[in-house]
């Protein structure tokens, strides 16, 4: 039973990655939890609006980093381990938005990708985190599984400099 009332929905408290581990560092951001992940926010980011122009983000100077990078230890599983354990026969759409750890997750999803039809993922190009991604980072796992770029479904432009910060991309077989 779950709080959403859907039999097919359940919550699991761990991270996905390229290996199964009992302990990995996860960095929590209290002010904006959606920015939390296995990579720390970069306090020296040159492109972050929240760091460099906090008033544009509706913040006071220093607020953004004040409660960032709070370290929490969590378990980590490969996507293949999770899908195998739950005996999931196929995946219509695999959605990844994991703050620059998408490539690590895909590395641990070789078997899962074979039974997945569509992958929708985010690519962060700028320096908000201590890691960013390129198309190569994800395509080295997607192309061998038969995926091709179908669409760049969203482009986020940085209002400070006009550069593309991140994109949502769709890959299909």
Regions found by a protein language model. Name each.
Residues 1-173:
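Phosphate/nucleotide-binding beta-alpha loop and adjacent structural elements of enzyme active sites
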